[in-house]
């Protein structure tokens, strides 16, 4: 007799026609190239959860597989659930169990916070103990409420597809910590004389119950933050391989997070958040002429804490996944990100997270450096995306927008590219691609190589002249 797992794989797996790692992609970012190619897309928790068109389409495909299946397997699956005939609602239950089996496979390679890593055998045992009246209700009227109730019974968690990795895993819990969650405030008390009160004594008396905070902890936080942002490599000691407690719980008030928590948070913010992507230069023929260069051209302001670009203007860049950070300023949904200048403190702030650590980066840059006494010239191209989670676009099925430098050699302006994929973006700086702004399409400017009486050719034109471009591609020098 075949096991339930083998029967589900035999009946449901033919409905998943896609490439490798598509299920992993679905569980993490909720995106597949085409929803009709994966039966698990029916359970994505959005407005189209168990949509009629999608379920009808998969049910028709399933009936073809069901009729081709041998009689013994069909009788076994009906005997396990005590059903006389196959219906659409029965198919949805089988597809949901297959979804749980695939989640077990995903959890074998990922450790997700608060999600129990159950084996398939444990899930089957718990499923057998599920109240029969609730199972009949699910088969009678399948809905998100009924499937969510079954999921909560098995995992003690709400059903969520994709899995909310950006707010549930320990990294993101650390990532979103506020300063007041790091340690408790302390109260400063004074002992003063009862008579002969001076003006200073009056102020001391008014400040008896004013919380001043832990100034030693604040100084240690500043030192660690400066160190982590100044050096590329550092060691953080972990006591007994344990990062808990991450957030101060009401039940565990005696267990206060240590300075280690803040150090891990700082490292994660520096390592994970980014809206800048360095592009590989496949051909140097697009190296710009320095005769038209400007000092402040291609400068971008990046917040080191939240990773967003703050001077992208009013461009609305498409991007799905974003690290949601706690804001200390009022922030409307998806409004223009900018820099706030405080006239009281004479400091600059990020309008999104309130961070004061702002850095400048160039989207295009030609620079020189020395290696063992040899002068080396290098060209750097970068792209700005609309999300601070650049790692989520590393999938060819994810489409996004980006701001890059204009490909014209005499132009130092930017251009907004739409509906890009990671493969298209990585091949952008090549000989065969052109992405010019509107001004460059109407205005012709001469470079050093175009001038007949040019006395000295700039460095950019020299690099462009050395690039070996052919009809079929290009070679780097």
Swiss-Prot record:
Looking at the Swiss-Prot or TrEMBL record, what is one Pfam family this protein matches?
Herpes_UL49_1
Quote a single Gene Ontology cellular component term: viral tegument
**What top-level branch of life does the organism fall under?**
Viruses
Which biological process terms from the Gene Ontology are attached to this UniProt entry?
Answer: viral process
InterPro entries membership: UL49 (IPR004339)
- Tell me its family: Belongs to the herpesviridae UL49 family.
| Name of this protein | Protein U33
**Organism this protein belongs to:** Human herpesvirus 7 (strain JI)
